[in-house]
């Protein structure tokens, strides 16, 4: 018979060696003090490659819960594409090969920066180099950023692009993201981007660097640079291939629709036949080939528990409800069989330092009731450490930690009485670094470690690991088989 287990996610509570501005270290936390003395615990990595993000990038709640719930490292699109290029696998991508085979001309359209939010310049240039080596004529349609990076950094990125130019690679157009990456159906903006990219209208005799300087002289920063085509580019032709290289979808849907959809009617467009592909899936209704399809992890923790015929309870307040349901279940909206979800409303305040307790008490009560109702598995998220950490208010963050500590105490006490194993960890840190060394307020997540405590019969040691090890550890505690797709248990 399966044993019962609880996973407590203390959102935004992590480890830092710094003490002065550490809300966790300075809070009243008798439950944690006992855990440190009496309970096996270890460190967990929550950022960078350990959760499928670029090296050094801080973790976030979405990837943290996906990693915990799936029991494996799910590489984010940016990393997946970067690895494909660095390991020389991109050139063999089936959809890419088919796109190259359709035309001698390839247009690459995307955001020219290293912001890593929508695109990466290394992807842009890496793909251009591969296509050029295959003998294709490559036209670059550079969208200037100025939002995820400095507002006047375009020339820095242009200098990187220019190192790759040659007989087969040319800059065709430049346009600010305000135009070519609109997402609010402001079609008059998109039209300007479209006309430069597809029709080569309007045109300038200036080179790209001179054109950017001229834009700055008119007080147009990178985001707002007017779309323009350069001498030597005469627009797209019938049967040209087009690859949209942004991996984030929301700001590429409109320009992709305008370029690729034959029944598009929001403005007048050219009647030419193009072969369009997208690097990731932008919209379920698009029929374009996709180079990197979304992974839907099979055999997640929730799925395995449901398949075993066991009952599970997922609960959090509003701020983290999607994380313990949709993200924890690997991007699945619908609950599994025998999965109950309980949403507790977050308090209606402007910022959570006004009420650092948030709705933790009510969330805790759902867990206690869940034990009374003999759920086999309970996952709960306490949002306080993260949401109050984001306000930058150290005193409020100490109250947030104390509140979570109090709820942990009640859960651990009852779990002992009801024979539940308990695993306590965090998706990422935040409140342990409220200011930097100079006393400046920090509101961001940290890129450090978090703790993993395991209160369970027969467990005397917990290995260090990552969030990908949490699901297999829960299954081990429950006496259920760990599926082959998952990584190893920490106990």
From Swiss-Prot:
The keyword Isomerase applies. Substrate binds at residues 118, 147-148, 177, 183, 248-251, 320. Binds 2 manganese ions per subunit. Belongs to the BPG-independent phosphoglycerate mutase family. Monomer. Catalyzes the interconversion of 2-phosphoglycerate and 3-phosphoglycerate. This is 2,3-bisphosphoglycerate-independent phosphoglycerate mutase. It comes from Sulfurimonas denitrificans (strain ATCC 33889 / DSM 1251) (Thiomicrospira denitrificans (strain ATCC 33889 / DSM 1251)). The gene is gpmI.
């Amino acid at each position: 018979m399966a044993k019962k287990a609880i996973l407590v996610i203390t959102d935004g509570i992590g480890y830092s060696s710094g003490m002065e501005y550490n809300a966790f270290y300075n809070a009243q936390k008798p439950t944690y003090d006992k855990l440190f003395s009496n309970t096996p615990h270890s460190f967990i990595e929550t950022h960078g490659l350990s959760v499928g993000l670029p090296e050094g990038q801080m973790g976030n709640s979405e990837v943290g819960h996906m990693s915990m719930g799936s029991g494996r490292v799910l590489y984010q699109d940016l990393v997946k594409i970067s690895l494909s290029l660095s390991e020389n696998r991109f050139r063999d991508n089936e959809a890419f090969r088919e796109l190259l085979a359709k035309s001698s001309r390839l247009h690459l359209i995307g955001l020219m920066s290293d912001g890593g939010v929508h695109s990466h310049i290394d992807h842009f240039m890496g793909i251009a180099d591969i296509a050029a080596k295959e003998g294709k004529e490559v036209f670059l349609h550079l969208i200037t950023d100025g939002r995820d990076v400095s507002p006047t950094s375009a020339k820095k990125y242009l200098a990187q692009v220019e190192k790759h130019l040659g007989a087969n690679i040319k800059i065709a157009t430049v346009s600010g993201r305000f135009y070519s990456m609109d997402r609010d159906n402001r079609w008059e903006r998109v039209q300007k981007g479209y006309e430069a990219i597809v029709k080569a209208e309007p045109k300038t005799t200036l080179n790209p660097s001179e054109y950017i300087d001229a834009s700055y002289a008119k007080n147009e920063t990178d985001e707002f640079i007017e779309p323009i085509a350069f001498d030597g580019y005469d627009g797209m032709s019938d049967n040209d291939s087009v690859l949209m290289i942004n991996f984030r979808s929301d700001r590429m849907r409109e320009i992709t629709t305008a370029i690729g959809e034959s029944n598009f009617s929001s403005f007048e467009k050219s009647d030419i036949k193009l072969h369009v592909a997208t690097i990731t899936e932008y919209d379920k209704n698009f029929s374009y080939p996709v180079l990197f399809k979304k992974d839907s992890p099979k055999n997640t923790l929730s799925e395995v528990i449901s398949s075993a015929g066991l009952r599970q309870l997922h609960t959090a307040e509003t701020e983290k409800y999607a994380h313990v349901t949709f993200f924890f279940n690997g991007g699945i909206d619908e609950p599994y069989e025998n999965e109950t979800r309980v949403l507790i409303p977050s308090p209606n305040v402007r910022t959570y330092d006004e009420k650092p307790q948030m709705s933790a008490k009510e969330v805790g009560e759902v867990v206690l009731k869940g034990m009374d109702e003999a759920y086999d598995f309970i996952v709960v998220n306490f949002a306080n450490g993260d949401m109050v950490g984001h306000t930058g208010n150290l005193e409020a963050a100490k109250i947030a930690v104390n509140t979570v500590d109090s709820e942990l105490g009640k859960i651990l006490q009852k779990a002992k009485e009801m024979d539940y194993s308990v695993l306590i960890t965090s998706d990422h840190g935040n409140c342990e670094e409220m200011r930097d060394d100079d006393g400046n307020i920090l509101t961001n997540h940290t890129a450090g470690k978090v703790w993993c405590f395991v209160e369970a019969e027969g467990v005397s040691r917990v290995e260090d690991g990552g969030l990908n090890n949490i699901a297999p550890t829960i299954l081990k505690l429950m006496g259920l088989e760990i599926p082959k797709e998952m990584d190893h248990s920490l106990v």
